[in-house]
């Protein structure tokens, strides 16, 4: 990966602690990602930093009323927004799990296991570039992070460790919204 990162993860301005914790968990769990602290930076400044890093995409976590609300993607090379937005209906941080989950060392490998066989797995594969499988049995102990996508009312995206136990926050996606860009 050129420059050490393929995807930059950032937030809207002045994010809440919960959103920052989600960003930190994602960066620690997903290889090839890094974060940019937004602060008061303009969109152009974010693009310049992404180009300097060698990133292909920027993942924005938008928030509303202090909670992550949507995940949007910007293609740095083609200079255009991706035509989909993942609406987040809730997240569960490491602190909210019933057992203590310590922060693990940064992941070096990842795989997507899409049990829902829906569009979220394809979107994650396109953005992050991880291989996609449709069975959980084949991945135990082979990857540092397993991105498990299950169908609920929407989708549930869980970041699991190599032992298939929780590694980081889980994200509940209400729906995928396709928009005209």
UniProtKB/Swiss-Prot annotation:
PROSITE patterns recorded: BRIX
Keyword Transferase: no
Entry keywords, A to Z: Ribosome biogenesis
Biological process per Gene Ontology, one example term: rRNA processing
Record domain Brix: where: 5-181
Record function comment: Probably involved in the biogenesis of the ribosome.
Name the record gives this protein: Probable Brix domain-containing ribosomal biogenesis protein
Origin species: Pyrobaculum aerophilum (strain ATCC 51768 / DSM 7523 / JCM 9630 / CIP 104966 / NBRC 100827 / IM2)
